[in-house]
Every structure is written in C-alpha cells, then in structure tokens.
C-alpha cells in the first residue's frame, strides 16, 4: 500500500512539474513563521510593534499642515489606503503619472514613510488575493530557464489573516490566495496602527519579488487555490 501511495505521489509530482515548472525556492522550516489565527492575535501583535511609530508618524504629519499645501501629501499612508493606491501603483508599475507628477511624489514620500517604520520583527506569514493574470505570470516565470521570481513593482498590500477571503471587497472574489513567507527585517507597516482597516493590513515596500515554494493546492476552509511564495527583497 505504501508503494502505491509513493507511486501516485510521484505521478502527481510529475504532473505538477509539467504544469508549474520546477520548484527553485524552498522554505527550510515553515513552522518558525508566525501565523495568526484570529483578529485579536493579529491586532495585538500589530499594535505592540507599530503603535509607537504610528503615533510619531501622526505627529509629524500634523506638524506638516503648517507648510504643506496638498492634502494628499499630509497623510500619504491614509491616502494610499483610501483611493490613491491605484494611481500610485500605476506610476510604479507603468510610469504613468499626471502633469504635476503627483503620484511619483506620493510614491517617494510613502517609500520614506515605510523606511522610517520598524522592520518586521520576526519571520511572518502574510496573505494576498490575486487575479488569474498574476498567477499566470507567476507560473510563466517559474517555468523559465532558469526560473525567475515575479516582481511586484508597486507597494504590496497584504493581510495578517487568511480570513481576508471573507472581506466584502472586490478582491475577495478572486479564486487565488497567496500565502507569503516574509523574512524578518522586511520593510513594512501595520496599517491599522494608523488608520482603521478591516483586513488587518500589512503594507510592504515596493520592488519585492515572489518565488513559488510549493505547488498550488485547494484550501477547504477558504475554498481558494493557495500559492505559497517566498518574499524576496532586494535590499537585505
């Protein structure tokens, strides 16, 4: 019976290799990555690690009211989380901007804001919903010779909780869920320490890469297809 299971495992592995390519990234010990099970745990962790910084950020932004005219520049993080994330990320991904270079400036300011925050203090699991186009590029890159991680040129919005799939937001309708293994010292911010977000959001620095670490599988709890990825930064 054991030999029969091994045979079918071998067949499944061969099918996955053909469909998704060889796995070139590997997480040595997934158990060491902190993963939250509920909102209370996630929020307690976020407040503990980011509230002091968030208070300083708000104080500085309040002082800037005396000299900065543009309202978006006074609250760059809140502005991003409101409606400007599309335009900011379009600038970073496609170099699209308005004549006043508003979104280039916002992207620069927000990058500095994130750099001023504490680094992620420990290895961490984050989640992100993505569309089929992203998944197709992830697979295509993984099947390259040699395999290459997929780059996210924009800021990366993620959640501390897998229950992001239950949010009443358009992204929750996507069928693909990234489970991201984030290394200690990554540049990122717990957004809820600054502004109220229902999804326990972590916002990560731009120009990150994601490498596929396991073949996708169906998650019974969320009814999503899970793609486990390693976050690869260019600055550490």
Language model segments and positions:
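Active-site and NAD+-binding cores of ADP-ribose-processing enzymes
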Residues: 131, 147, 159-162, 166-236
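N-terminal subdomain
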Residues: 1-156, 160-163, 219-236
